[in-house]
Amino acid sequence: MRAKKQLLAALQDIVKDMGLAWPEKATIDTPKATGFGDLAANIALVLAKQAGQNPRELATRIADALRNRDADITAIDIAGPGFLNVTYSQDFWRETILRAQEAGSAFGSSDTGAGRKVQVEYVSANPTGPLHIGHGRGAAVGDSLARIMRFAGYDVSTEYYINDAGRQMRLLGLSVWVRAKELAGRPVTLPEDFYRGDYIKDIARELMEKEPGLLDLDDAAGEDRCFAYAMSSILDGIKQDLADFRVEHQVWFSERSLVEGGAVEKTFNRLKEAGLAFEQDGALWFRTTDFGDDKDRVLRKSDGTLTYFSSDIAYHDNKYDRGFDLVVDIWGADHHGYIPRMRAAVAALGRKPEAFDVVLIQLVNLLRGGELVAMSTRAGQFETLADVVKETGADAARFMFLSRKSDSPLDFDLELVKQRTMDNPVYYVQYAHARVCSVLRKAAERGIEMPAQLDGASLAPLSGDDEMELLRLLDRFEETVAGAATALAPHHISHYLMEVAGALHSYYARQPILNATEQDVIVPRLALLRAVGCVLANGLSLLGVSAPESM
């Protein structure tokens, strides 16, 4: 937000000139009610003790300095115990249009991240079956967060961790092997916890057709072959489903590579040398209680098998070795209890707490016409992400996933999401962009020319309250993006876009654009709409949602 940046810089200079230190509790906010200026600052209240002055007296002193320093300010009111309510000129707000025109697709970007290297890991579902709708929410959050952080000046790398080691993988191979025998008419005993979905039968049938001698193998070799083929097949399907959902992972990282490459043992040795790993009852333990965990954790069981935690520690060690300043893991909410031990591991690796963060993804309750759809991957009862995207479209699904805070449960009604009405959030926002494009097209058809470059004087007729409201809202875009990146909260963007769309729809309903009686307001209003369209398009792009020009 240009206004907030400008006011902050001016206040910091004033405080410095007073020979005082900038207080940590100083804030600059947008007043929720009208009549209290464009911005409100509490600087006099939190600086009064240090300055040895009454807050209102100090506020008067600061206000006088502000008036002399910033010509864009038209009014400063001192409210209550000493709040500064600052109002900027209409010329100042109209310049938002010029900045949007100049920046185009970069409008709203910033250097907030200052090139900080960030890795975002998301989805990372076991390659034991197709992605379901819950994975889709994590995919939308992770992919959008990466887009937002890049736009805010971070150097972001995205990654999918392939869980291709451990019990679930052995169970996948066994499930396909048993189904292959069953398809061949051989007597089988179905394991209690095997994967039951029809996709397992399909994989078994496909493999038998490609390799007629499959069942000549003994059980161990057969299970290994079935595992390798099934994992490759399922992973290919996952990659395609994500591509169709407009989700990109730059790196696909194998868990097995950590084990076979010696990274896990290397991490064990590192922890032992630091006195943080110890043997007890034939097992290897990690002393996570030294870092605030409620109990120590097993790394290697007494039978020699590795825990998931051991690979995860080695994996994060690898991440930091690759030079990332911040590692962001996006996990299902059922992994909440895993966070303390992972933070302990990061600390044991010698990393600062701020180098690691977790975004939790709450469950998605899939509904169809208000009726809950039961889901279980192992039982083969689930709505795949591919089916959902095919039915609703990627735009609607992504926007719906991003419409609420990620750690809040989400009801996803397939029938509601498909509606092309203003009750559907994605339609509401996309229609606002299409409406802007429609007006601009009609203007061109009527021979109304939009200058390639506008200037402040040509925009002067924009002076209405609703126009100033729109301009102040557009000015907030950069701040909203930066805040979403810092808070790891993509839903901030969807909420903001709903607000912009609402303001645009209201403005369109109240103010004539092409048929305005005052001819001198037509081009300025078109320029305002074009700036709104720029913000809507840029914001939707950050969510991985299209900005249609007609609907």
Swiss-Prot record:
A motif ('HIGH' region) lies at residues 125-135. It catalyses: tRNA(Arg) + L-arginine + ATP = L-arginyl-tRNA(Arg) + AMP + diphosphate. One of its GO terms (molecular function) is ATP binding. Signal peptide: none annotated. Pfam families: Arg_tRNA_synt_N, DALR_1, tRNA-synt_1d. GO terms for biological process: arginyl-tRNA aminoacylation. The keyword Ligase applies. It is found in: Cytoplasm. It is an enzyme of class 6 (ligase). Monomer. This is Arginine--tRNA ligase. The gene is argS.
